[in-house]
């Protein structure tokens, strides 16, 4: 019979404990941005390769060195911060994220003459002061986004979230790209997402729901349960809610695409 010595068992338990401690430490890096302090959990392990957590003032990012984009950006959106944000003029200072290795991050040159916008995940318009506004212009908070999608579809969705937050007082929001299908398009070294999603959860109602759209100009705006979106993207986005809660739908405003010219 195969037997492990006490020392061997102790060593294995210590190693497992170290792994758990490491995971817990990473999960707790910026818990304030997540519902109940619990960040999303990656189920599709292909997505977990070369990921790093980055904490900012009013949002947090988990960045992929493979796609050179965020996997998600998380915000605790408060009505008082949005009121402060209304008094700020936009100051466009896009920059590469110095905390990321050069071989895993997006550079300004990747987007140059690409025809794609540098699309914010955590919106600049949610930032309450100059410091957080500058943080939002890090390329670690950006994905390559169809220009008309950004202006005509995504901007109205972001506005709807702000309207909700002012009524609710507070919301937790997770915004991310999806890379569905087998073909991959790049701008420079950055992979272009096929879809974008925005999950909104209410701590008061203990419910969430999500907008999901293709990354193209004429994409329909879909509203889906969190449970369905989790299956699509391979990430448990709201791990502190039960399956039943995630199958129910938080009521989201109807969003119509803007007809303004780009």
Where do the PLM segments sit?
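Domain-level detector for secreted/extracellular nuclease and nuclease-toxin modules, and
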Residues: 2-6, 19-262
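Sec-dependent N-terminal signal peptides
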Residues: 8-17
